[in-house]
C-alpha cells in the first residue's frame, strides 16, 4: 500500500506542536512539542518508537530553529520517514468567511490567512511563519502543503446564528460576525459520535463540548454546525482558563471610564487574567479547581460559574435541534478528564433527560471514552478528540 505519511504542524505564538501520522490508519510515528520560543529556556520534546526525548533549542530559538531541529536531528534518526512524507498539514485558527474547507496552500491562500490576522492576531502570524519554514525545509513538498481551518466547519451556520445585532454595514464592510473555533475537533467528535450511535452523519443531532484551556460548544443538526459559542474571536462564550467568555459589553466602558483602565489593559484582563484564573485568583488549571472543590471557596466559586455557563449553552442549543437531541459529547483536556465538570453540568440538565452514571463517568478519563449516563438517560458521551488525524486526512486527500 502506498505511503500516506503526513507531517502535521500546529504553530502557536510561542510553541510548535508536530506529528507524523499515517493518514490511512491513524498510526502516529512521531509526536512532539517545541515551546518557550524567544526565551532562554526554549526546548523541544518528542516521542518516537515509544521513547521520549528532550533537547534544548538554544536561547531565543523560535519556529525556524524548531523546524530545522525536527528535520536535521529528529528525522535524521529515521530518514525513511522523511522519504515517505507525502504532505504537510497546517492547523490554521482563522480562515474568515472565505475558507469553507481545507485548501492546498498557494500565494492566494497565504493572502487569505494574512487577511484574517485581525481576528486571530496571536495565531495566524505564527501559522504563516510555520508555512514559510515548512516550504523552506521541505522543498520537495512545495505543492503539498495544506491549510486546515478551525473556522471552516462553522461556515454552515445560518445568518441568524452568525450575525450580531449591530449595524449590518459592519458585517458587509468589515466582516464582523461570529466565526467560531475548534471546528476541526467539533467535526471529528461529531463523526465519531455518528459511528457510536449507528446513525448516518446527515441525520445526527448532537451538541459537542470542546473543553480545554479554551472552550466552545457547537450545535450540530443533521451533521452540520448551526451555532457555536465562540464569536468573532475566541473570547466569546464559555468560562475558559484565562478568558472571561460572555460578559456585558458595557463592562468594558465601565473599566475604562470609572476605573481608568486602558484598552490594552482591558484586553489583557479579559483574555489573560479572567476565566478560572480570575475566579480563583490562583490558577487557570481546572485540576486545582476540581481537587479543591469541597474545601476551598475559590475553587467552588470557579467550578460553579464554569458549570452554570456550560449548562446554559447546552440547554439553549437544545432549542436548535428541531425536537431531537441524540447526545451531548464531551472532548478536549477538561471534557475528557474532568468528571466533576461533566457531572455538575449534566445535573443541571435533568429536564433534557440526562442522568449521570457516577461509575461510568469516573471510568471515562485519561484516554478512555464512552457513555457516561445511565441506560435510561439521554446519552452523554466522552470522545477523545484527534484534530491531528483530521488534519492529516485532509492533507492526504487534497494532495492525492
UniProtKB/Swiss-Prot annotation:
The residues that hold ATP are 17, 210-214, 285-287, 333-337
Annotated protein name in UniProt: Acetate kinase
* Pathway assigned to this chain's UniProt record: Metabolic intermediate biosynthesis; acetyl-CoA biosynthesis; acetyl-CoA from acetate: step 1/2
Pfam families, per database record: Acetate_kinase (PF00871)
Q: Can you provide one Gene Ontology molecular function annotated for this UniProt record?
A: ATP binding
Which residues does substrate bind?
Answer: 91
As to how many cofactors bind and how, the note says:
Mg(2+). Can also accept Mn(2+).
Provide the binding site for Mg(2+). Answer: 10, 387
Under the heading InterPro entries, the entry gives: Ac/propionate_kinase (IPR004372), Aliphatic_acid_kin_short-chain (IPR000890), Aliphatic_acid_kinase_CS (IPR023865), ATPase_NBD (IPR043129)
List the PROSITE patterns hit by this protein, alphabetically.
Answer: ACETATE_KINASE_1, ACETATE_KINASE_2
Q: What is the top EC class of this enzyme, as a single word?
A: transferase
What Gene3D superfamilies does the entry give? Answer: 3.30.420.40
- Which positions are catalytic residues? 150
**PANTHER family according to UniProt:** ACETATE KINASE (PTHR21060:SF21)
Question: Where does this protein reside within or beyond the cell?
Answer: Cytoplasm
Q: Which branch of life, at top level?
A: Bacteria
Q: Which GO terms describe its biological process?
A: acetate metabolic process; acetyl-CoA biosynthetic process
Keyword GTP-binding: yes or no?
A: no
Its Enzyme Commission number(s) read: 2.7.2.1
Taxonomically, what lineage is the organism? Bacteria, Pseudomonadati, Pseudomonadota, Gammaproteobacteria, Enterobacterales
Q: Where is this site: Transition state stabilizer?
A: 182, 243
Cofactors that this protein relies on: Mg(2+); Mn(2+)
Reactions it catalyzes: acetate + ATP = acetyl phosphate + ADP
Q: Which GO terms describe its cellular component?
A: cytosol
**Family of this protein:** Belongs to the acetokinase family.
Amino acid at each position: 500500500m502506498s505511503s500516506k505519511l503526513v507531517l502535521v504542524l500546529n504553530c502557536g505564538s510561542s510553541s510548535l506542536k508536530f506529528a507524523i501520522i499515517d493518514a490511512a490508519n491513524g498510526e502516529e510515528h512521531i509526536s512532539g512539542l517545541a515551546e518557550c520560543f524567544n526565551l532562554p529556556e526554549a526546548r523541544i520534546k518528542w516521542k518516537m518508537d515509544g521513547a521520549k526525548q528532550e533537547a534544548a533549542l538554544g536561547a531565543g530559538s523560535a519556529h525556524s530553529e524548531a523546524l530545522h531541529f525536527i528535520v536535521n536531528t529528529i528525522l535524521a534518526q529515521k530518514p525513511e520517514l522523511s522519504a515517505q512524507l507525502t504532505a504537510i498539514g497546517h492547523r490554521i485558527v482563522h480562515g474568515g468567511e472565505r475558507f469553507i474547507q481545507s485548501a492546498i496552500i498557494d500565494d492566494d491562500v497565504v493572502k487569505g490567512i494574512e487577511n484574517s490576522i485581525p481576528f486571530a492576531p496571536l495565531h495566524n502570524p505564527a501559522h504563516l511563519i510555520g508555512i514559510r519554514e515548512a516550504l523552506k525545509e521541505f522543498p520537495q513538498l512545495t505543492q503539498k502543503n495544506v491549510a486546515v481551518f478551525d473556522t471552516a466547519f462553522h461556515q454552515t451556520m445560518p445568518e441568524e446564528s452568525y450575525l450580531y445585532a449591530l449595524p449590518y454595514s459592519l458585517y458587509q464592510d468589515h466582516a464582523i460576525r461570529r466565526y467560531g473555533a475548534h471546528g476541526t475537533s467539533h467535526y471529528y467528535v461529531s463523526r465519531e459520535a455518528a459511528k457510536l450511535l449507528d446513525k448516518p452523519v446527515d441525520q445526527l443531532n448532537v451538541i459537542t463540548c470542546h473543553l480545554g484551556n479554551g472552550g466552545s460548544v457547537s450545535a450540530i443538526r443533521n451533521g452540520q454546525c448551526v451555532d457555536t459559542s465562540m464569536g468573532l474571536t475566541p473570547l466569546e462564550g464559555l468560562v475558559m482558563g484565562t478568558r472571561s467568555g460572555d460578559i456585558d459589553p458595557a463592562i468594558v466602558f465601565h473599566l475604562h471610564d470609572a476605573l481608568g483602565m486602558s484598552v490594552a489593559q482591558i484586553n489583557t484582563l479579559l483574555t489573560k487574567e479572567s476565566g478560572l484564573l480570575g475566579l480563583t485568583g490562583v490558577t487557570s488549571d481546572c485540576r486545582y479547581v476540581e481537587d479543591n472543590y469541597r474545601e476551598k471557596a475559590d475553587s467552588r466559586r470557579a467550578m460553579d460559574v464554569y458549570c452554570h455557563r456550560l449548562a446554559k449553552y447546552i440547554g439553549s442549543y437544545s432549542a436548535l435541534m428541531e425536537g431531537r437531541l441524540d447526545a451531548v459529547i464531551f472532548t478536549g483536556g477538561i471534557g475528557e478528564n474532568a468528571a466533576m465538570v461533566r457531572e455538575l453540568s449534566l445535573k443541571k440538565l435533568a429536564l433534557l433527560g440526562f442522568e449521570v452514571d457516577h461509575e461510568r463517568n469516573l471510568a471515562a478519563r485519561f484516554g478512555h471514552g464512552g457513555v457516561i449516563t445511565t441506560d435510561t438517560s439521554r446519552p452523554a458521551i466522552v470522545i477523545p478528540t484527534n484534530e491531528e488525524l483530521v488534519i492529516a486526512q485532509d492533507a492526504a486527500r487534497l494532495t492525492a
